[in-house]
Regions:
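Conserved SAM-binding loop
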Residues: 10-111
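S-adenosyl-L-methionine-dependent methyltransferase catalytic module, highlighting the catalytic core
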Residues: 60, 89-238
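Short cysteine-rich clusters marking metal-coordination/redox-active sites
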Residues: 244-247, 263-266
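Catalytic phosphate/metal-binding cores of nucleic-acid and nucleotide-processing enzymes, i.e., regions
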Residues: 2-4, 9-12
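Short metal-binding segments enriched for Cys and/or His
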Residues: 268-283
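Short, surface-exposed charged micro-motifs
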Residues: 65-67, 123, 252, 267-269
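Short, intrinsically disordered, charge-biased short linear motifs at domain edges
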Residues: 11, 227-235, 245-254
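Residues immediately within or flanking Cys/His clusters that coordinate Zn2+
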Residues: 241, 260
């Protein structure tokens, strides 16, 4: 995202200071206005080109199985994640369950033909307010077009044009209440024809970090000063906001020395590793 848009896009989206904003798949470039970050693969670098930014509360969770009560979030941001998701129906339904409204951004389907990525398994378009997802047969279905495009991007000024024409190259959907979508899938994915696709999660003890570019570092530093001016949620007690994946009960941290949080209703435990609360079904214990 261009640096100027980073600082003003929350105004364009109509996000108010007291709105609670959740971002799914924030990775190395979270939106300035996001109050809570969710990332599932903090211990796997294949989906990230830069280092993971943790400059505000981050929960390790699955976007298709979110640990938040229904309609508990005012705004949900999800940028450049949907095109990777094996079960988009479950994922989109979960976003609209948790959030009152939100924003979804993906590469535009036509652009993804020109500049495909190994982990993109869907072409995505916004057709009159409905997301249209079309299954890809392989990560690079049009190699001749891709090669031609890669020669084009070497032209002087191309990436400046790209930044200035963001809606032309990306699918953007602002939704309110529910997310409308249509999924065109003829058969099961053959993931051997793709690269960098997550089909399951392997528990880990830590965080895998890549180097963080200067631009992301500048954004993170400036966010510390700007966010208190535009958000009323700069001191969030995460266990009070999230809920148990099994029963929806409240989670509590018994003491600061604990390495887990416990559900007050069903007593399910979720671990805390490397300082991050991990709310994943495959890591919970009883």
């Amino acid at each position: 995202m261009p640096l100027l848009n980073y600082f003003v896009c929350h105004r364009t989206l109509g996000i108010k200071r007291h709105d609670l904003v959740l971002e799914i798949g924030s990775g190395g470039d979270p939106f300035l206005r996001s109050d809570i970050l969710v990332d599932q693969f903090v211990d796997d670098e294949v989906e990230r080109h830069t280092g993971l930014i943790i400059d505000r509360p981050l929960v390790v969770a699955d976007g298709a199985d979110l640990p938040f009560p229904s309609k508990s979030v005012d705004y949900v941001i999800c940028a450049h994640v949907l095109e990777h998701v094996p079960n988009p129906a479950k994922f989109l339904d979960e976003l609209s369950r948790v959030g009152k409204r939100g924003l979804i951004i993906t590469p535009k389907g036509d652009y993804d033909k020109l500049h495909p990525k190994g982990g993109h398994i869907w072409y995505v378009w916004n057709v009159d307010g409905t997301l249209l997802l079309k299954q890809k047969e392989s990560w690079n279905e049009y190699p001749d077009i891709r090669e031609y495009f890669h020669q084009m991007v070497r032209l002087p000024g191309f990436w400046k044009l790209f930044d200035q024409s963001y809606p032309f190259f990306n699918t953007i959907l602002e939704w309110d209440g529910t997310i409308r979508y249509q999924i065109h899938q003829d058969k099961q994915f053959d993931f051997s024809k793709f690269r960098k696709v997550h089909t399951h999660h392997e528990p880990s003890e830590g965080i895998v970090q890549k180097p963080t570019p200067s631009k992301q570092k500048i954004k993170a530093r400036m966010a510390r000063f700007v966010r208190p001016l535009i958000s009323a949620h700069t001191n969030i007690d995460v266990p009070r906001i999230v809920c148990c994946l099994l029963c929806g009960g409240k989670l509590s941290l018994m003491s600061h020395a604990d390495t887990y949080v416990t559900c007050s209703r069903c007593e399910t435990r979720f671990p805390i590793r490397a300082g991050l609360l991990r709310l994943l079904r495959e890591e919970m214990t009883h």
